[in-house]
Swiss-Prot record:
Descriptive protein name: Membrane protein insertase YidC 1
UniProt keyword annotations, A-Z: Cell membrane, Chaperone, Lipoprotein, Membrane, Palmitate, Protein transport, Signal, Transmembrane, Transmembrane helix, Transport
Similarity field: Belongs to the OXA1/ALB3/YidC family. Type 2 subfamily.
Lipidated residues (S-diacylglycerol cysteine): C26
Domain of life: Bacteria
Record function comment: Required for the insertion and/or proper folding and/or complex formation of integral membrane proteins into the membrane. Involved in integration of membrane proteins that insert both dependently and independently of the Sec translocase complex, as well as at least some lipoproteins.
Organism field: Streptococcus pyogenes serotype M18 (strain MGAS8232)
GO molecular function, one term: membrane insertase activity
Cited InterPro entries: YidC/ALB3/OXA1/COX18 (IPR001708), YidC/Oxa/ALB_C (IPR028055), YidC/YidC1/YidC2_Firmicutes (IPR023060), YidC_ALB_C (IPR047196)
Amino acid sequence: MRKVLRVKKNIKIARIVPLVLLLVACGRGEVTAQSSSGWDQLVYLFARAIQWLSFDGSIGVGIILFTLTIRLMLMPLFNMQIKSSQKMQDIQPELRELQKKYAGKDTQTRMKLAEESQALYKKYGVNPYASLLPLLIQMPVMIALFQALTRVSFLKTGTFLWVELAQHDHLYLLPVLAAVFTFLSTWLTNLAAKEKNVMMTVMIYVMPLMIFFMGFNLASGVVLYWTVSNAFQVVQLLLLNNPFKIIAERQRLANEEKERRLRERRARKKAMKRK
C-alpha cells in the first residue's frame, strides 16, 4: 500500500515539476555570451545553434531547421509518451470499475484497491512513469528554445518570406497556421482514445484559440517556431501513432471477437439440437 501511495505521490509531483520549471525559467532579461547563469548559457547555446543554421543569414531558416532538429531528437521520447498515454486511456474503464468495487474509505479497502490497480497495470504492461519521463525531458528543451527566440537580440532581427521576425505578422497568416496545426495535433492525439477526456476535448479548441490570439502580439519568430513544431507533431502522429490505423485495428479486433462469440453460440445451439 505504501509503495502504491508513494507512486501516486511521485506522479503528482512530476506533474507539477514542468509548471515549476516554466515559472523558474521564464526570465525576461536579455541573454548574452556573458550571462552567468547555467540556464541562460543553455538558452544562448540554442541561439548560437539557430544562428549557425541560418543559411544566407536567414534567421527564419535557422529557426525552422533547429526546431526540426530538436523535434527529431525528441521523437523517441514523444513516441513513448503517446503510447503510454494511450495505454493509460485504454484501461480507464477497468480502473473505474475497480474504484466502484472498492469504494470504501477504510484502510483494508484502499489497500485492496491499490493491489488490484497494480495487478491491472501489470496485466496490460502499463507503467505510470512512462509518460512522465519524456515530458520532464522535453519541457526544459522546449522552454530554452522558446527563450532563445525571445531573449537573444540577434535572433530578433531579419525577415522570412513576408514577415519581420521581430514584429507580429501583419497578414496574420502565421498565427492562423500555428492555430491550425495546434488544433490538428491535439485533435489527432485525442482521436484514438477509447473514452474522451472532457478536459482534453476542451483543450482541442481552447489551445488553438490561445495560440491564435497570442500570435497577434508576439514576434513572428516565436510564432514560426510554434507553427513548425506543431506541424512536425502532426506528421509524427500520422506516421508513428496514426489514430486512424489505431481505430481501424481496434474495430477489426472487435469484429473478430464478435465473430468468435457468434461461432461459439452457433456451436452451442448445434450441440443442444444433437442432444
